[in-house]
Amino acid sequence: MERHRFQWQLLDELLDGRDRSQLSLLHFAPEPCLEVRLRPQFGTYLSADLFRTNVDRQVDVQNMPMADNSFDVILCSMVLHYVEDFEAGLREINRVLKPGGLAMLPVPMIHQNTCHTPAADSVLNMVVEPGPDFYEAYQVFFDEVRVHRSTDYDDSLHFYLEQTDEHPFPMRLAHQKYADTIPVSRKALDVNSD
C-alpha cells in the first residue's frame, strides 16, 4: 500500500547512517508488510496492540507498562483516532521514547477540521475524526513535530492514496488522488546527561 511505502521511505531517510541493530523500536498495530522487514533490522523490536493477539505484547497506548526512555523509534500508524484519550496516548509515547528518539504517528485525514465525538462513532469506531489540525496537539507533548507530506516527493514514487468513492477528504489532490501525511515527533536530547 502507498502509505506503507511512504512510511518505509521516510523511516529510511530519518535513520540514514544509524546502525539499526543498536536501536529499539516499538511498533503499535504493526502492519505485516513493515513488521517482516523491520523486525530483523532492529536490535530490539517489540510489536504491540490492545486487542490483537499476534503481537509481542498486548498494550494500551494510554497506559504502557514500559520504563521511561525505553525506545529509540515508535511507530503508531492509524491508531490514535481510536484511542479514548489520545492525549494520554501521546503523553505515554513521549514518556517511553528515549531522548533524541522519534515517533511516527499518522492518522487519517477525515475532515477539514478535527471533530471530537462524545462517544466512538458506531460505524467507524473513531473517538476523534481527524483533520489537518489534529497534529497541533502533538506539539504539547514533543519538542519537535514535523509533518512530512507525500507531495514533497517525486510523483513517480506514487506516495499518494487513491480513493474510489467521492468523499470530500481534505487532502484531495485530483480525482481519486489524495495526499498523505506523516507527522514525525521528536523528543529532545537530555541536555543534563554526560
Kindly give the residue locations of the regions a language model identified:
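A short SAM/SAH-binding and catalytic strip from SAM-dependent methyltransferases
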Residues: 72-84
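Short intrinsically disordered, low-complexity coil segments enriched in acidic
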Residues: 1-7, 77, 95-98
